[in-house]
């Protein structure tokens, strides 16, 4: 998440949950009470959250037409979404408990034996939550960005799909499913 305030830019990698509400919904998150994002809160007007989907390096050798002509260069294919809105900090123990439970559930639900907060000492969890401050970002603007070699020929895109589907690097197979031959 990128925040600008008091002439400084603050960039943080934070776990966020999408929550229904307003036109585009809201993003819910939390930081420690000593975190710069919270300390600079009053000077921050808007924030931008960036969600990156699968992305991958594209070898020039994978382009059929370019390989023949020798007129090719490496590329990068990607899909991303930017969500922008106003941030509001929430100092509420009940909200924080519900938020942390929802965040944990979103990460644990697909596990064979998911962990839940009922397995932890309630006093310990309360002490952890007390050191955190919640926030919500009311999403006012969404912007999707993609580059999937759409300017290439159908033969080139089909070749990319085949190569990416066999590429062991993270995200390559998922990206192959997004490219339209």
What role is predicted for each listed range?
Residues 1-181:
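Binding-site signature for planar aromatic cofactors or substrates
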